[in-house]
Swiss-Prot record:
Cellular component, GO annotation: cytosol; plasma membrane
Reaction equation(s) it catalyzes: a 4-hydroxy-3-(all-trans-polyprenyl)benzoate + H(+) = a 2-(all-trans-polyprenyl)phenol + CO2
EC number(s) stated in the UniProt entry for this protein: 4.1.1.98
Family matches, as Gene3D superfamilies: Single helix bin (1.20.5.570), UbiD C-terminal domain-like (3.40.1670.10)
Protein name as it appears in the record: 3-octaprenyl-4-hydroxybenzoate carboxy-lyase
Note describing how the cofactor binds: Binds 1 prenylated FMN per subunit.
General function of this protein: Catalyzes the decarboxylation of 3-octaprenyl-4-hydroxy benzoate to 2-octaprenylphenol, an intermediate step in ubiquinone biosynthesis.
Positions annotated as active site in the UniProt record: 287 (proton donor)
Any one GO MF annotation of this record: metal ion binding
Gene Ontology BP annotations: ubiquinone biosynthetic process
UniProt keyword annotation of Lyase present: yes
Binding-site residues, Mn(2+): 172, 238
Keywords: Cell membrane, Decarboxylase, Flavoprotein, FMN, Lyase, Manganese, Membrane, Metal-binding, Ubiquinone biosynthesis
Length: 488
């Protein structure tokens, strides 16, 4: 099932019993976080707060609170189907040369489909049904969540930020949290390596002193939202990928005040500029680590215009100690990552990002080991192949007889197949999440790799232990007798 816009997705979720309308007044200040957190931990439905205290605009929360709803948003019927999306991305990232004419013809439909999903620009769009400009702009009219008691101010969380660098034809889509500091100003918290920050830096170099155009889409269709957090190849735009997920081209409309193009069916659009040099201290905020982050300075985004649909819906979330929505997204997108990694490293049999590891800070890899040192090659590959894992602090690699998603198995492998000194890889001075206060320097820290595989000659001089395996005939006989034993 594919969804044209957020409202279409809401209807689809409601028909499946995956969305609950909340008629009781609930405040965006702390209360929505409590309700959404309890619901997410119970694997409950998406929530549409129809009467947020003090506001006329409904708030949509816990939208991607289960892996199943993430899969639905990507046009898949089950989480398992996300592997097929991963296979498509793996192919597009590094397409294999055709083995012959027949093979070339078989791959042609894939490329034709990708080309046919180029975004479609429209003149009129529902996201511009209502236009608010100049002194009438007031972010205080939006039910922006204040998520945690120690948060400094309301925080925009699901904004899809649209930018374009001066040297690029393609726009960048990124999701960056935005602290509200005035009726028309927010702080754009983008890290220096992220697409929006790179576009801004290039703009300042080429157009010194000139304001940098920015747009933020709130309440886009699910395919576009999820396309912005998926490892899309650099040769494929997020909008085109969203079209592939949705099954039809993404409709875009030109902003009223710039040449940026935004999702035409989004609920709310913020248009404006960043004035070079205008910075402000951001935070503290409770984040996905379960802690409040330290204060740091980031650019200020001045909102010059708000356009929106009639009776818009505000899409929001919170981040905190896992499980939260980012952790659930990580669980679902994990299935997309597996085929992409296997394309580069066919020896990998599974890859798992434990949600307890704050979405990406720890990875467990199982593999078919083929030579001494092989596990170390794989762990180094995980850190370097996809930029999504540049902040992964711990990589555990073990054999394919281990279930990467079962801590009982993983811990057994670590404690029986590892020598701490020989099998631990430490790398210093590597990129680390700026929200990671455990690193000695902000944005720079170490990584640890754990080789929990069976050791080959060259890695050890000792006779390696043999795993105990039960006798299959005895197991079958006891299976047949079990009911007669009266044990359970």
């Amino acid at each position: 099932m594919q969804y044209r816009d957020l409202r279409d997705f809401i209807r689809g979720l409601e028909q499946r019993g995956e969305l609950k309308r909340i008629q009781v007044p609930i405040s965006p200040v702390l209360e929505m976080t409590e309700v959404c957190d309890r619901t997410l931990r119970a694997k409950g439905p998406a929530l549409l707060f129809e009467k947020p205290t003090g506001f006329d605009i409904p708030v949509l929360g816990n939208l991607f609170g289960t892996p199943e709803r993430v899969a639905m948003g990507m046009g898949a019927e089950s989480v398992d189907e996300l592997r097929e999306i991963g296979k498509l991305l793996a192919f597009l990232k590094e397409p294999e040369p055709p083995k012959g004419l027949k093979d070339a013809w078989s791959k042609l439909p894939i490329f034709k489909k990708v080309v046919s999903m180029a975004p479609k620009v429209v003149k009129d769009a529902v996201c511009q049904e209502v236009v608010v400009e100049g002194d009438d702009v007031d972010l205080g009219a939006l039910p922006i969540q204040h998520c945690w008691p120690g948060d400094v101010a309301p925080l925009i969380t699901w904004g899809l930020t649209v930018t374009r660098g001066p040297n690029k034809d393609r726009q960048n889509l990124g999701i960056y949290r935005q602290q509200v500091i005035g009726r028309n100003k927010v702080i754009m918290r983008w890290l220096s390596h992220r697409g929006g920050a790179l576009d801004y830096r290039e703009w300042c170099e080429k157009n010194p002193g000139q304001p940098f155009p920015v747009a933020v889409a709130l309440g886009a269709d699910p395919a576009t939202i999820l396309g912005a957090v998926t490892p899309v190849p650099d040769t494929l735009s997020e909008y085109a990928f969203a079209g592939l997920l949705r099954g039809n081209r993404t409709e875009l409309v030109k902003c009223r005040g710039s040449n940026l193009q935004v999702p035409a069916t989004a609920e709310i659009i913020l248009e404006g500029v960043i004035h070079p040099g205008e910075m402000a201290p951001e935070g503290p905020y409770g984040d996905h680590t379960g802690y409040y982050n330290e204060v740091d300075s980031f650019p200020v985004f001045t909102v010059e215009r708000i356009t929106h649909r009639h009776k818009p819906i505000y899409h929001s979330t919170y981040t905190g100690r896992p499980p939260d929505e980012p952790a659930i997204l990580g669980v679902a997108l994990n299935e997309v990552f597996v085929p992409i990694l296997q394309k580069q490293f066919p020896e990998i049999t599974d890859f798992y990002l434990p949600p307890e590891g704050c979405s990406y800070r720890m990875a467990v890899v199982t593999m078919k080991k083929q030579y001494p040192g092989h596990a170390k090659r794989v762990m180094l590959g995980v850190w370097s192949f996809l930029r999504q894992f540049m902040y992964t602090k711990f990589v555990i690699v073990t054999d394919d007889d281990i279930n990467a998603r079962d801590w009982n198995d993983v811990i057994w492998a670590i404690t029986t197949r590892m020598d701490p000194k020989r099998d631990t890889v430490m790398i210093d001075n590597t990129p680390i999440d700026y929200l990671d206060f455990a690193s000695p320097v902000s944005g720079l820290g170490s990584k640890m790799g754990l080789d929990a595989t069976h050791k080959w000659p060259g890695e050890t001089t000792r006779e390696w232990g043999r795993v105990i395996v039960k006798d299959e005939a005895v197991t079958r006989r006891i299976d047949e007798l079990w009911d007669q034993l009266g044990i359970d």
